[in-house]
UniProtKB/Swiss-Prot annotation:
Disulfide bonds: none annotated. It comes from Nostoc punctiforme (strain ATCC 29133 / PCC 73102). Part of the 50S ribosomal subunit. Forms a cluster with proteins L3 and L19. In the 70S ribosome, L14 and L19 interact and together make contacts with the 16S rRNA in bridges B5 and B8. Keywords: Ribonucleoprotein, Ribosomal protein, RNA-binding, rRNA-binding. This is Large ribosomal subunit protein uL14. One of its GO terms (molecular function) is structural constituent of ribosome. The lineage of its organism: Bacteria, Bacillati, Cyanobacteriota, Cyanophyceae, Nostocales.
C-alpha cells in the first residue's frame, strides 16, 4: 500500500537507491498503489556517476510491498520491504538488472521485461 510520501527501495541497477512516491498513477484522485501500479517518484538517494541522479523525478513500477496481496487461489503474499523498478516512458526498465524477488502479478500487468530480468518470481 504505497501512497504519496512513502519511501521505497530501488530494485534495479539504474543508480538510484531510495525513492519517495509523489503520485500514484491511474485514476483521478487515487490514494494507494499496489504491486504492478505505476508511480511518479523523486530520487532521494543515488549512487554517484550513474544514469539517475538525486532529485530526479522518475516513473517507477511497484514490485514488492509490505502489505499482503491476496490472490484468487486464497493465498496471500507479502514481502519484507517496499520496492520499485524505475521505468522509461515505454514501460521498459532503465536498469539492466533487477534485484530480489518480484510478484507474479507483474506478468498480468504486462511488465514482462521486469519479470524476465528478476532472479525469482513469487
Amino acid at each position: 500500500m504505497i501512497q504519496p510520501q512513502t519511501y521505497l527501495n530501488v530494485a534495479d541497477n539504474s543508480g538510484a537507491r531510495k525513492l519517495m512516491c509523489i503520485r500514484v498513477l491511474g485514476g483521478g484522485n487515487r490514494r494507494y498503489g499496489f504491486i504492478g501500479d505505476k508511480i511518479i517518484a523523486v530520487v532521494k538517494d543515488a549512487t554517484p556517476n550513474m544514469a539517475v541522479k538525486k532529485s530526479d523525478v522518475v516513473e517507477a513500477v511497484i514490485v514488492r510491498t509490505r502489505k499482503a496481496v491476496s490472490r484468487d487461489s486464497g493465498m496471500s503474499i507479502r514481502f519484507d520491504d517496499n520496492a520499485a523498478v524505475i521505468i522509461n516512458k515505454d514501460g521498459n526498465p532503465r536498469g539492466t538488472r533487477v534485484f530480489g524477488p518480484v510478484a507474479r502479478e507483474l506478468r498480468d500487468k504486462n511488465f514482462t521485461k521486469i519479470v524476465s530480468l528478476a532472479p525469482e518470481v513469487l
